[in-house]
Regions:
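Short extracytoplasmic/periplasmic juxtamembrane "stem" segments immediately C-terminal to an N-terminal membrane anchor
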Residues: 1-3
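Second-shell loop/turn segments in exported
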Residues: 40-44
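Conserved histidines in hydrophobic membrane contexts and catalytic metal-binding motifs
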Residues: 9-39, 51-103
């Protein structure tokens, strides 16, 4: 197994976000809820890819993408795409934009 990226998602709760591969070369996302024993594991092949999330954000007004973080919001896995001062929340399972939030 190997970890390709690590991030921290701060939504209603904080999650440590890891993207990587298993020994069988299956790509997975792992979310660990801070201060809890809750761990969520997702097969990346079963939802929106990081690249698709960027494209969905751009279709909805994002310019240059600063950062993309896998996270968990309102009981569902999401991609948070940061562009400038705006955050685009893309549903991992439904492959669509859930919300756009600006600072």
């Amino acid at each position: 197994s190997k970890v390709d990226s690590f991030g921290i998602y701060n939504g209603d709760k904080t999650y440590y976000s890891l993207l990587g591969e298993t020994d069988q070369e299956k790509k997975k996302a792992v979310l660990i809820e801070k201060g809890s024993d809750k761990i969520f594991v997702y097969k990346l092949s079963e939802g929106t890819s990081k690249r698709q999330a960027e494209k969905i954000a751009k279709k909805n007004g994002a310019d240059a993408i600063d950062k993309v973080t896998f996270g968990y919001l309102n009981g569902r896995p999401i991609w948070e795409v940061k562009s400038g001062k705006s955050y685009y929340i893309v549903d991992f399972e439904k492959r669509k934009l859930l919300s756009k939030e600006g600072l």
